[in-house]
């Protein structure tokens, strides 16, 4: 039957990508339907019970800055919070949280059920409705047909998923859930380029059988307790729990080696490529044969369960080998395994067949987000889902697509890497992937993106008001520090010595003093008995005050580096954002080699910047393209039209600093 209501956007899948996509399009005012095979698993953490980390935490902050749910849900469900790289520079500091699976899932579902313009429906999707070269809806397992102007597909590991434990395997999207076999077959009929990837998960352990007296405790940060959302509060956190650390040993490694003849990875049963940066334990032992030990983190799954996640022993070895290797580790000698570890193979589709909006180039209105694009990780999925949801909503509203640039967001880096370079293994975000990471920090994600989010319609009044209070306070106080001066006469020598190590010998602005190594904002404001501080509090709320101080300190201390990077961005941006016409035939560009023109015609880059990052492209080829565009008057700057955020970065340069 044809469902009587027509939607603007249909989102298929209720994982981290699907939930962010559905919430984003609904926030924009698009009538949105979220189709999931099981409403009870909305927002489920299928693998590790953690959010964030190096590069990943940056994505979560960006999702939050654009009004997304992941950071806020983590604040409500997080049972341990830490700042990684806290002793290093601000560009690489990252938030990571352990989450209670149940509380996190509840927080996501609560947001879905209370979001205006969003409908939920429990049914697996078996088919897409395609008319000509555009998608017009989806068909469920029992034949219900839903029509929509745009469809976002976020199928995770469910597309023709196959689960492996030793040499045994069976069809499944994850343990306990069916695979999407019919939908996978339908997508293959559409001739979208695809391949196979694999990922894995470790056995889960009953905490009542762990000897914690033999393990090293790893507590979270307590002073201050981190929060993930820019609107979050430490008071929102439930009870906090420690993690625990053990190690593999030579006996563990011998057990693993003895089982490799029954490993699906090493017997050719698994054909999909696994994640380089989250390898299975058997892969670690093989690749790092000289190491006699690997660190294993025992992470609590939640407050109402005894289950522990042993981070570091993802495996598809037979269960008897899993049992032996677990028992070989200190503190786990008597451990009971609650669930076996397994590997899962699944279909993905070459992201080079996508536009930077995450819309497929072949089928109008069809968007892909998450692991279907070859990425790995909750955070990468959520960020893509948010972007796909925004652009699906804009597509339905007949507005131009939006995607942040590489110099605007880690989300921009992620998408650009996917659509220009493709993937040969599951893609994971790192800070090292971003050329402009000093400007793309966790702490300024809101300064970079919230104004754009407001223009897009995904940022509500509460977030917008809080952002403006923060931005205005940072701007006012930074200006005060730059224009308030002290002299050897007005700053007592003993105070200067206590703060700077010696008296000052000429006039300094407070900003110049703050720029000194080891000098803090509070230290500067405390000079002259506090007279160097602001006349009124910057904020009443302690968390907001801490955020404001952090922005001020980083902006002033790193001003020179940030300005240098801004200049580099401006110089490189001249050609980076020049658009390539949709219908250009690259065989007609004089001077291009056959190989280069063939690649350009195959991947259809949207900008000169994207073209330059395609494998095999040369500076000479880019020059020929620029000449071709100039002669024909074809090129225009990306963002020169009505796309939101085209001018936001220039307007917010001071705020970002």
Swiss-Prot record:
InterPro entries: FAD/NAD-bd_sf (IPR036188), GIDA_C_N (IPR049312), MnmG (IPR004416), MnmG-rel (IPR002218), MnmG-rel_CS (IPR020595), MnmG_C (IPR026904), MnmG_C_subdom (IPR047001), MnmG_C_subdom_sf (IPR044920). GO terms for cellular component: cytosol. Residues 636-657 are annotated as: Disordered. GO terms for molecular function: flavin adenine dinucleotide binding. It is found in: Cytoplasm. Its main location: cytoplasm. FAD binds at residues 13-18. It holds the Pfam family SAM_GIDA_C. The keyword rRNA-binding does not apply. GO terms for biological process: tRNA methylation; tRNA wobble uridine modification. It comes from the Bacteria. Its cofactor is FAD. The keyword tRNA-binding does not apply. Keywords: Cytoplasm, FAD, Flavoprotein, NAD, tRNA processing. NAD(+) binds at residues 274-288. PROSITE patterns: GIDA_1, GIDA_2. Homodimer. Heterotetramer of two MnmE and two MnmG subunits. NAD-binding protein involved in the addition of a carboxymethylaminomethyl (cmnm) group at the wobble position (U34) of certain tRNAs, forming tRNA-cmnm(5)s(2)U34. Belongs to the MnmG family. This is tRNA uridine 5-carboxymethylaminomethyl modification enzyme MnmG. It comes from Burkholderia pseudomallei (strain K96243). The lineage of its organism: Bacteria, Pseudomonadati, Pseudomonadota, Betaproteobacteria, Burkholderiales.
């Amino acid at each position: 039957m044809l469902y009587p209501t027509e939607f603007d956007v249909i989102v298929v899948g209720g994982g981290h990508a699907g939930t962010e996509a559905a919430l984003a399009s609904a926030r924009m005012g698009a009538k949105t339907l979220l189709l999931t095979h099981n409403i009870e698993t909305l927002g489920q953490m299928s693998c590790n019970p953690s959010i964030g980390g190096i590069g990943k935490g940056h994505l979560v902050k960006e999702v939050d800055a654009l009004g997304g749910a992941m950071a806020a849900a983590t604040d409500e469900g997080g049972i341990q919070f830490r700042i990684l790289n806290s002793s290093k520079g601000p560009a690489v500091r990252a938030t990571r949280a352990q989450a209670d699976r149940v509380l996190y899932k509840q927080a996501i579902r609560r947001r879905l059920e209370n979001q205006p313009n969003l409908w939920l429906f429990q049914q697996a999707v078996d088919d897409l409705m395609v008319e000509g070269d555009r998608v017009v809806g989806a068909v469920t397992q029992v034949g219900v047909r839903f029509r929509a102007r745009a469809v976002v597909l976020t199928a995770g590991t469910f597309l023709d998923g196959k689960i492996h434990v030793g040499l045994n395997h069976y069809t499944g999207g994850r343990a306990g859930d069916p695979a999407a076999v019919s939908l996978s077959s339908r997508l293959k009929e559409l001739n979208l380029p695809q391949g196979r990837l694999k990922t894995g998960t470790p056995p889960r352990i009953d905490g009542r059988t762990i000897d914690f007296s033999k393990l090293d405790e790893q507590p979270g940060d307590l002073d201050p307790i981190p929060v993930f959302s820019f609107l979050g509060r430490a008071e929102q956190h439930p009870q906090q729990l420690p993690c625990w650390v053990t190690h593999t040993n030579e006996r563990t490694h011998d057990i693993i080696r003895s089982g490799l003849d029954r490993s699906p990875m090493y017997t050719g049963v698994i054909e999909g490529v696994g994640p380089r940066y989250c390898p299975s334990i058997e892969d670690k032992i093989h690749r790092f044969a000289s190491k006699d030990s690997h660190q294993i983190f025992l992470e609590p799954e939640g407050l109402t369960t005894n289950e522990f996640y042993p981070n570091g022993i993802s495996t598809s070895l037979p269960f008897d080998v899993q049992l032996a290797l677990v028992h070989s580790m200190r503190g786990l000698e008597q451990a009971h395994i609650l669930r076996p570890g397994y590997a899962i193979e699944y279909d993905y589709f070459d992201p080079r067949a996508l536009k930077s909006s995450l819309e497929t180039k072949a089928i109008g209105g069809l968007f892909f987000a998450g692991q279907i694009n070859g990425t790995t990780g909750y955070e990468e999925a959520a960020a893509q889902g948010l972007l796909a949801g925004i652009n699906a909503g804009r597509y339905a509203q007949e507005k131009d697509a939006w995607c942040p640039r590489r110099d605007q967001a880690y989300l921009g880096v992620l998408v650009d890497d996917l659509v220009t370079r493709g993937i040969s293994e599951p893609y994971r975000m790192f800070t090292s992937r971003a050329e402009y990471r000093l400007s793309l920090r966790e702490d300024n994600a809101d300064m970079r993106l919230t104004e754009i989010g407001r223009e897009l319609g995904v940022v509500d009044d509460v977030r917008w008001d809080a952002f403006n209070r923060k931005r205005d306070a940072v701007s006012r106080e930074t200006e005060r520090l730059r224009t308030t001066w002290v002299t050897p006469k007005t700053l007592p020598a003993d105070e200067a010595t206590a703060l700077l190590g010696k008296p000052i010998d000429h006039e300094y602005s407070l900003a110049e003093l703050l720029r000194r190594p080891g000098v803090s904002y509070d230290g500067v404001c405390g000079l002259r008995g506090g007279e160097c501080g602001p006349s009124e509090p910057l904020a009443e709320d302690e968390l907001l005050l801490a955020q404001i101080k952090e922005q001020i300190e980083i902006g002033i201390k790193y001003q020179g580096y940030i300005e240098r990077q801004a200049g580099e961005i401006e110089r490189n941006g001249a050609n980076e954002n020049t658009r390539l016409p949709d219908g250009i035939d690259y065989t007609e560009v004089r001077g291009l080699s056959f190989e280069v023109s063939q690649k350009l015609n195959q991947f259809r880059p949207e900008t000169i910047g994207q073209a330059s990052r395609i494998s095999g492209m040369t500076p000479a080829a880019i020059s020929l393209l620029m000449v071709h565009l100039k002669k024909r008057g074809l090129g225009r700057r990306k963002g020169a039209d009505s796309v939101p955020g085209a001018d936001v970065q220039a307007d917010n340069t001071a705020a970002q600093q």
